Amino acid sequence: MGSRALPPGPVQTLIFLDLEATGLPFSQPKITELCLLAVHRYALEGLSAPQGPSPTAPVPPRVLDKLSLCVAPGKVCSPAASEITGLSTAVLAAHGRRAFDADLVNLIRTFLQRQPQPWCLVAHNGDRYDFPLLRAELALLGLASALDDAFCVDSIAALKALEPTGSSSEHGPRKSYSLGSVYTRLYGQAPPDSHTAEGDVLALLSVCQWRPRALLRWVDAHAKPFSTVKPMYVITTSTGTNPRPSAVTATVPLARASDTGPNLRGDRSPKPAPSPKMCPGAPPGEGLLAPLGLLAFLTLAVAMLYGLSLAMPGQ
Protein backbone atom coordinates (compact mmCIF):
# COMPACT_ATOMS: atom_id res chain seq x y z
CA MET A 1 0.00 0.00 0.00
CA GLY A 2 1.58 3.26 -1.09
CA SER A 3 2.00 6.24 1.17
CA ARG A 4 -0.54 8.25 -0.89
CA ALA A 5 -2.89 5.37 -1.73
CA LEU A 6 -6.61 6.10 -1.66
CA PRO A 7 -9.21 3.52 -0.64
CA PRO A 8 -9.95 1.02 -3.44
CA GLY A 9 -13.51 2.36 -3.56
CA PRO A 10 -15.85 4.60 -1.58
CA VAL A 11 -15.30 4.33 2.17
CA GLN A 12 -18.01 2.05 3.52
CA THR A 13 -17.60 2.57 7.28
CA LEU A 14 -16.61 5.68 9.20
CA ILE A 15 -15.02 4.79 12.55
CA PHE A 16 -15.33 7.89 14.73
CA LEU A 17 -12.48 7.76 17.25
CA ASP A 18 -11.54 9.64 20.40
CA LEU A 19 -8.77 9.00 22.92
CA GLU A 20 -8.30 10.43 26.40
CA ALA A 21 -4.78 10.24 27.80
CA THR A 22 -2.42 11.20 30.62
CA GLY A 23 -1.16 14.44 29.06
CA LEU A 24 0.12 16.34 26.05
CA PRO A 25 2.45 14.93 23.35
CA PHE A 26 5.69 16.19 24.93
CA SER A 27 5.01 14.04 28.02
CA GLN A 28 4.82 10.78 26.04
CA PRO A 29 1.21 10.23 27.13
CA LYS A 30 -0.56 6.92 27.59
CA ILE A 31 -4.18 6.20 26.76
CA THR A 32 -6.67 6.27 29.65
CA GLU A 33 -9.90 5.91 27.64
CA LEU A 34 -10.89 5.15 24.06
CA CYS A 35 -14.11 5.03 22.11
CA LEU A 36 -14.77 3.86 18.56
CA LEU A 37 -18.16 4.41 16.94
CA ALA A 38 -18.79 2.70 13.59
CA VAL A 39 -21.34 4.18 11.17
CA HIS A 40 -22.03 2.84 7.68
CA ARG A 41 -22.05 5.41 4.88
CA TYR A 42 -25.67 4.43 4.13
CA ALA A 43 -26.68 5.99 7.46
CA LEU A 44 -25.17 9.32 6.36
CA GLU A 45 -26.06 9.39 2.66
CA GLY A 46 -29.78 9.55 3.38
CA LEU A 47 -29.54 12.42 5.86
CA SER A 48 -30.52 15.97 5.01
CA ALA A 49 -28.50 18.86 6.42
CA PRO A 50 -29.98 20.49 9.53
CA GLN A 51 -31.88 23.67 8.66
CA GLY A 52 -32.28 27.04 10.38
CA PRO A 53 -29.89 29.54 11.97
CA SER A 54 -29.35 27.36 15.06
CA PRO A 55 -30.67 23.90 14.30
CA THR A 56 -30.79 21.28 16.99
CA ALA A 57 -28.16 18.57 16.98
CA PRO A 58 -29.29 15.59 14.91
CA VAL A 59 -30.09 12.27 16.50
CA PRO A 60 -27.39 9.61 15.95
CA PRO A 61 -28.20 6.90 13.39
CA ARG A 62 -30.19 4.02 14.81
CA VAL A 63 -27.75 1.45 13.45
CA LEU A 64 -24.23 1.89 14.78
CA ASP A 65 -21.63 -0.11 16.68
CA LYS A 66 -19.69 1.25 19.64
CA LEU A 67 -16.62 0.17 21.58
CA SER A 68 -15.79 2.16 24.72
CA LEU A 69 -13.12 1.23 27.27
CA CYS A 70 -11.16 2.73 30.13
CA VAL A 71 -7.48 1.77 30.28
CA ALA A 72 -4.86 1.66 33.04
CA PRO A 73 -2.10 3.92 31.68
CA GLY A 74 0.83 2.64 33.73
CA LYS A 75 1.96 6.20 34.49
CA VAL A 76 0.66 9.16 36.46
CA CYS A 77 -1.91 11.39 34.78
CA SER A 78 -1.04 15.06 34.70
CA PRO A 79 -3.22 17.18 37.03
CA ALA A 80 -4.62 19.08 34.04
CA ALA A 81 -5.58 15.87 32.23
CA SER A 82 -7.25 14.46 35.34
CA GLU A 83 -9.22 17.66 35.87
CA ILE A 84 -10.43 17.70 32.25
CA THR A 85 -11.26 14.01 31.85
CA GLY A 86 -12.20 13.07 35.41
CA LEU A 87 -9.80 10.12 35.23
CA SER A 88 -6.69 9.48 37.28
CA THR A 89 -4.27 6.58 37.54
CA ALA A 90 -5.49 5.84 41.07
CA VAL A 91 -9.16 5.82 40.05
CA LEU A 92 -8.49 3.53 37.09
CA ALA A 93 -6.46 1.16 39.30
CA ALA A 94 -9.18 1.14 41.97
CA HIS A 95 -11.65 0.00 39.30
CA GLY A 96 -9.34 -2.77 38.17
CA ARG A 97 -8.80 -1.42 34.67
CA ARG A 98 -6.25 -3.27 32.53
CA ALA A 99 -3.41 -1.85 30.46
CA PHE A 100 -3.37 -1.23 26.73
CA ASP A 101 -2.21 -4.71 25.74
CA ALA A 102 -2.34 -7.26 22.94
CA ASP A 103 -5.79 -8.42 24.06
CA LEU A 104 -7.13 -4.90 23.61
CA VAL A 105 -5.54 -4.64 20.18
CA ASN A 106 -7.22 -7.91 19.20
CA LEU A 107 -10.52 -6.52 20.50
CA ILE A 108 -10.13 -3.42 18.33
CA ARG A 109 -9.24 -5.59 15.34
CA THR A 110 -12.30 -7.77 15.92
CA PHE A 111 -14.51 -4.68 16.20
CA LEU A 112 -13.18 -3.34 12.88
CA GLN A 113 -13.49 -6.67 11.11
CA ARG A 114 -17.22 -6.69 11.84
CA GLN A 115 -17.57 -3.54 9.72
CA PRO A 116 -17.77 -3.40 5.91
CA GLN A 117 -14.51 -2.26 4.30
CA PRO A 118 -12.88 0.09 3.48
CA TRP A 119 -12.81 1.54 7.00
CA CYS A 120 -11.79 5.11 7.74
CA LEU A 121 -10.89 6.36 11.21
CA VAL A 122 -12.20 9.90 11.81
CA ALA A 123 -10.78 11.88 14.74
CA HIS A 124 -10.86 15.57 15.62
CA ASN A 125 -7.25 16.80 15.60
CA GLY A 126 -6.44 13.19 14.78
CA ASP A 127 -3.37 13.98 12.67
CA ARG A 128 -1.66 15.67 15.61
CA TYR A 129 -2.88 13.62 18.55
CA ASP A 130 -5.17 10.58 18.32
CA PHE A 131 -3.57 8.83 15.34
CA PRO A 132 0.10 9.29 16.42
CA LEU A 133 -0.76 8.28 20.01
CA LEU A 134 -2.56 5.14 18.87
CA ARG A 135 0.39 4.26 16.62
CA ALA A 136 2.79 4.76 19.56
CA GLU A 137 0.77 2.42 21.78
CA LEU A 138 0.70 -0.23 19.04
CA ALA A 139 4.44 0.13 18.41
CA LEU A 140 5.25 -0.33 22.11
CA LEU A 141 3.57 -3.74 21.90
CA GLY A 142 5.40 -4.68 18.70
CA LEU A 143 2.06 -4.48 16.85
CA ALA A 144 2.66 -1.34 14.81
CA SER A 145 1.03 -2.84 11.71
CA ALA A 146 -2.12 -4.12 13.45
CA LEU A 147 -4.35 -1.43 11.88
CA ASP A 148 -2.48 -0.91 8.63
CA ASP A 149 -5.50 -1.94 6.55
CA ALA A 150 -7.47 1.06 7.86
CA PHE A 151 -7.55 4.60 6.47
CA CYS A 152 -7.84 7.84 8.43
CA VAL A 153 -8.82 11.51 8.15
CA ASP A 154 -8.67 14.49 10.49
CA SER A 155 -12.12 16.05 10.86
CA ILE A 156 -10.60 19.51 11.38
CA ALA A 157 -9.24 19.45 7.82
CA ALA A 158 -12.61 18.24 6.56
CA LEU A 159 -14.57 20.98 8.33
CA LYS A 160 -12.23 23.70 7.10
CA ALA A 161 -12.68 22.45 3.55
CA LEU A 162 -16.48 22.19 3.83
CA GLU A 163 -17.09 25.54 5.50
CA PRO A 164 -18.74 28.09 3.18
CA THR A 165 -16.25 30.51 1.63
CA GLY A 166 -17.70 33.70 3.12
CA SER A 167 -18.43 32.36 6.58
CA SER A 168 -15.34 33.81 8.26
CA SER A 169 -14.41 37.47 8.46
CA GLU A 170 -10.98 38.39 7.17
CA HIS A 171 -10.62 41.09 9.84
CA GLY A 172 -12.50 39.35 12.64
CA PRO A 173 -11.16 37.06 15.33
CA ARG A 174 -9.67 33.81 14.14
CA LYS A 175 -12.30 31.10 14.05
CA SER A 176 -11.75 28.22 16.44
CA TYR A 177 -12.00 24.66 15.18
CA SER A 178 -11.95 22.96 18.55
CA LEU A 179 -14.69 20.36 18.74
CA GLY A 180 -16.63 22.31 21.37
CA SER A 181 -16.42 25.54 19.37
CA VAL A 182 -17.57 23.94 16.12
CA TYR A 183 -20.45 22.14 17.84
CA THR A 184 -21.58 25.35 19.56
CA ARG A 185 -21.29 27.31 16.31
CA LEU A 186 -23.46 24.79 14.46
CA TYR A 187 -26.06 23.93 17.09
CA GLY A 188 -26.07 26.89 19.48
CA GLN A 189 -25.12 24.95 22.60
CA ALA A 190 -22.12 23.23 24.14
CA PRO A 191 -21.76 19.52 23.47
CA PRO A 192 -22.83 17.24 26.32
CA ASP A 193 -20.26 15.08 28.12
CA SER A 194 -17.21 16.88 26.74
CA HIS A 195 -13.82 15.27 27.36
CA THR A 196 -15.14 11.79 27.82
CA ALA A 197 -14.16 9.58 24.91
CA GLU A 198 -17.75 8.55 24.22
CA GLY A 199 -19.12 12.07 24.62
CA ASP A 200 -16.55 13.51 22.22
CA VAL A 201 -17.20 10.78 19.65
CA LEU A 202 -20.94 11.47 19.72
CA ALA A 203 -20.30 15.21 19.41
CA LEU A 204 -18.00 14.57 16.45
CA LEU A 205 -20.66 12.43 14.78
CA SER A 206 -23.19 15.24 15.23
CA VAL A 207 -20.78 17.73 13.65
CA CYS A 208 -20.20 15.40 10.70
CA GLN A 209 -23.98 15.09 10.24
CA TRP A 210 -24.02 18.82 9.42
CA ARG A 211 -23.17 18.21 5.73
CA PRO A 212 -23.06 14.43 5.51
CA ARG A 213 -22.92 13.86 1.75
CA ALA A 214 -20.26 16.54 1.24
CA LEU A 215 -18.28 14.99 4.09
CA LEU A 216 -18.42 11.54 2.49
CA ARG A 217 -17.13 12.93 -0.83
CA TRP A 218 -14.27 14.68 0.99
CA VAL A 219 -13.36 11.53 2.93
CA ASP A 220 -13.31 9.43 -0.25
CA ALA A 221 -10.89 11.92 -1.83
CA HIS A 222 -8.60 12.55 1.15
CA ALA A 223 -8.45 9.38 3.26
CA LYS A 224 -4.86 8.24 3.78
CA PRO A 225 -3.51 4.88 4.95
CA PHE A 226 -3.17 4.63 8.72
CA SER A 227 0.20 2.99 8.05
CA THR A 228 1.59 6.40 6.99
CA VAL A 229 1.02 7.91 10.45
CA LYS A 230 4.22 8.29 12.46
CA PRO A 231 4.12 7.29 16.15
CA MET A 232 3.95 10.19 18.58
CA TYR A 233 7.06 8.83 20.34
CA VAL A 234 9.27 5.76 20.47
CA ILE A 235 10.57 4.31 23.74
CA THR A 236 13.70 2.15 23.59
CA THR A 237 14.52 -0.23 26.43
CA SER A 238 17.61 -2.24 27.32
CA THR A 239 15.97 -5.17 29.12
CA GLY A 240 15.75 -7.73 26.37
CA THR A 241 13.60 -5.73 23.96
CA ASN A 242 16.42 -4.16 21.99
CA PRO A 243 18.72 -6.75 20.45
CA ARG A 244 21.38 -4.21 19.56
CA PRO A 245 23.79 -3.23 22.36
CA SER A 246 23.91 0.38 23.35
CA ALA A 247 27.01 2.50 22.88
CA VAL A 248 27.86 2.20 26.57
CA THR A 249 27.84 -1.59 26.68
CA ALA A 250 29.85 -1.77 23.47
CA THR A 251 32.68 0.54 24.47
CA VAL A 252 33.23 -0.07 28.17
CA PRO A 253 34.67 -3.64 27.88
CA LEU A 254 37.12 -2.54 25.19
CA ALA A 255 38.38 0.27 27.35
CA ARG A 256 38.99 -2.10 30.25
CA ALA A 257 40.71 -4.82 28.20
CA SER A 258 43.97 -2.96 27.81
CA ASP A 259 44.24 -2.46 31.56
CA THR A 260 43.71 -6.06 32.65
CA GLY A 261 45.42 -9.44 32.30
CA PRO A 262 45.99 -11.46 29.14
CA ASN A 263 42.82 -13.55 29.58
CA LEU A 264 40.70 -10.75 28.11
CA ARG A 265 40.49 -10.81 24.34
CA GLY A 266 40.13 -7.10 23.92
CA ASP A 267 43.92 -6.62 23.57
CA ARG A 268 44.69 -8.08 20.14
CA SER A 269 48.43 -7.09 20.09
CA PRO A 270 50.19 -8.95 22.95
CA LYS A 271 53.76 -7.94 23.67
CA PRO A 272 56.42 -10.55 22.63
CA ALA A 273 58.25 -12.43 25.38
CA PRO A 274 61.89 -11.41 26.02
CA SER A 275 64.49 -13.35 24.00
CA PRO A 276 66.33 -15.98 26.08
CA LYS A 277 69.64 -14.60 24.79
CA MET A 278 69.04 -11.26 26.39
CA CYS A 279 69.62 -10.39 29.97
CA PRO A 280 66.59 -8.67 31.37
CA GLY A 281 67.27 -4.97 31.58
CA ALA A 282 70.54 -5.16 29.50
CA PRO A 283 71.02 -2.98 26.44
CA PRO A 284 70.57 -4.74 23.06
CA GLY A 285 73.86 -6.35 21.70
CA GLU A 286 75.48 -6.88 25.09
CA GLY A 287 74.59 -10.55 24.97
CA LEU A 288 76.93 -11.08 21.93
CA LEU A 289 80.17 -10.11 23.78
CA ALA A 290 80.75 -13.53 25.41
CA PRO A 291 80.84 -15.65 22.22
CA LEU A 292 82.92 -13.05 20.37
CA GLY A 293 85.54 -12.97 23.15
CA LEU A 294 85.85 -16.76 23.16
CA LEU A 295 86.37 -16.84 19.39
CA ALA A 296 89.14 -14.23 19.61
CA PHE A 297 90.91 -16.17 22.37
CA LEU A 298 90.89 -19.41 20.33
CA THR A 299 92.23 -17.60 17.23
CA LEU A 300 95.11 -16.13 19.24
CA ALA A 301 96.00 -19.55 20.74
CA VAL A 302 96.11 -21.20 17.30
CA ALA A 303 98.38 -18.46 15.98
CA MET A 304 100.85 -18.85 18.89
CA LEU A 305 101.06 -22.62 18.42
CA TYR A 306 101.69 -22.16 14.71
CA GLY A 307 104.48 -19.69 15.48
CA LEU A 308 106.17 -22.10 17.89
CA SER A 309 106.12 -24.89 15.32
CA LEU A 310 107.98 -22.69 12.85
CA ALA A 311 110.67 -21.87 15.44
CA MET A 312 111.58 -25.55 16.01
CA PRO A 313 112.44 -26.97 12.54
CA GLY A 314 114.44 -29.91 13.77
CA GLN A 315 111.67 -31.62 15.38
Curated annotation (Swiss-Prot):
UniProt region (Disordered), positions on chain: 256-282
Cofactor binding: number and manner: Binds 2 Mg(2+) per subunit. The second magnesium ion interacts with only one residue. Substitution with Mn(2+) results in partial activity.
Cofactor(s) of this protein: Mg(2+)
Highest taxon, organism lineage: Eukaryota
Residue ranges of the region described as Interaction with UBQLN1: 243-315
CC per GO annotation: cytoplasm; cytosol; endoplasmic reticulum membrane; nucleus
Annotated positions of the Phosphoserine modification: S78, S167
Membrane topology: Peripheral membrane protein
GO terms of biological process kind: DNA catabolic process; DNA metabolic process; negative regulation of innate immune response
Alphabetized UniProt keyword annotations: Cell cycle, Cytoplasm, Endoplasmic reticulum, Exonuclease, Hydrolase, Magnesium, Membrane, Metal-binding, Nuclease, Nucleus, Phosphoprotein, Ubl conjugation
Ligand binding (Mg(2+) 1): D18, E20, D200
Keyword Cytoplasm: yes
Chain positions covered by the region annotation Necessary for endoplasmic reticulum localization: 236-315
Protein family (similarity comment): Belongs to the exonuclease superfamily. TREX family.
Subunit structure as annotated in this protein's UniProt entry: Homodimer. Interacts (via proline-rich region) with TCERG1/CA150 (via the second WW domain). Component of the SET complex, composed of at least ANP32A, APEX1, HMGB2, NME1, SET and TREX1. Within this complex, directly interacts with SET; this interaction does not result in TREX1 inhibition. Also interacts with NME1, but only following translocation to the nucleus. Directly interacts with UBQLN1 (via ubiquitin-like domain); the interaction may control TREX1 subcellular location.
Stated name of the protein: Three-prime repair exonuclease 1
Organism whose genome encodes this protein: Bos taurus
Lineage: Eukaryota, Metazoa, Chordata, Craniata, Vertebrata
